[in-house]
Amino acid sequence: MRAVIQRAKEAKVTVGGEVVGAIDAGFVVLLGITHEDTEDDAAYLAEKIAHLRVFEDEDGKMNRSLLDVGGAVLSVSQFTLYGDCRKGRRPNFMAAAKPDHALPLYEAFNAALRERGVHVETGVFGAMMDVSLTNDGPVTLIIDSSEKPGNR
């Protein structure tokens, strides 16, 4: 499971001209899911994201977490995070999980964040979405659950 995390001052996701999710300060999380991912991967990423200390404290140091600042997450499923661009000019998406495997894990990830006290707004799984945000910093991080200690 792969997450691209962007610290945002505000963000929203629109489907068919209608806003379906919006947050004030927090993270926009673009989440990609691959075939081998499990609920353990979802829980691992949720725990990491909820506690990442990338918000500034009173001294201007990145020392506060999403929970510390009362931030929210705008969670957007994005299979293209598993696009393989090594050959040719058209990405290969064979590493991206099919919807029947990915949707329950996307929902498990969002539920795991909520269990940790994070307010979560979402896009629409599988839909064409317009995501807009005001980057804060910018601060952008990539976390891949396959790189956690003891994994695969």
Curated annotation (Swiss-Prot):
Q: What is this protein called?
A: D-aminoacyl-tRNA deacylase
**Domain note:** A Gly-cisPro motif from one monomer fits into the active site of the other monomer to allow specific chiral rejection of L-amino acids.
Gene Ontology BP annotations: D-amino acid catabolic process
Where found?
A: Cytoplasm
Gene3D superfamilies in alphabetical order: D-tyrosyl-tRNA(Tyr) deacylase
- Alphabetical list of InterPro entries matching this protein: Daa-tRNA_deacyls_DTD, DTD-like_sf
Spell out the subunit comment.
Homodimer.
What is its biological role?
An aminoacyl-tRNA editing enzyme that deacylates mischarged D-aminoacyl-tRNAs. Also deacylates mischarged glycyl-tRNA(Ala), protecting cells against glycine mischarging by AlaRS. Acts via tRNA-based rather than protein-based catalysis; rejects L-amino acids rather than detecting D-amino acids in the active site. By recycling D-aminoacyl-tRNA to D-amino acids and free tRNA molecules, this enzyme counteracts the toxicity associated with the formation of D-aminoacyl-tRNA entities in vivo and helps enforce protein L-homochirality.
Identify the species of origin. Thermus aquaticus
State a GO cellular component annotated for this protein: cytoplasm
Example GO molecular function? D-tyrosyl-tRNA(Tyr) deacylase activity
State its Enzyme Commission number(s).
Answer: 3.1.1.96
> PANTHER family attached here?
D-AMINOACYL-TRNA DEACYLASE 1, D-TYROSYL-TRNA TYR DEACYLASE
Reactions catalysed, as given in the entry: glycyl-tRNA(Ala) + H2O = tRNA(Ala) + glycine + H(+); a D-aminoacyl-tRNA + H2O = a tRNA + a D-alpha-amino acid + H(+)
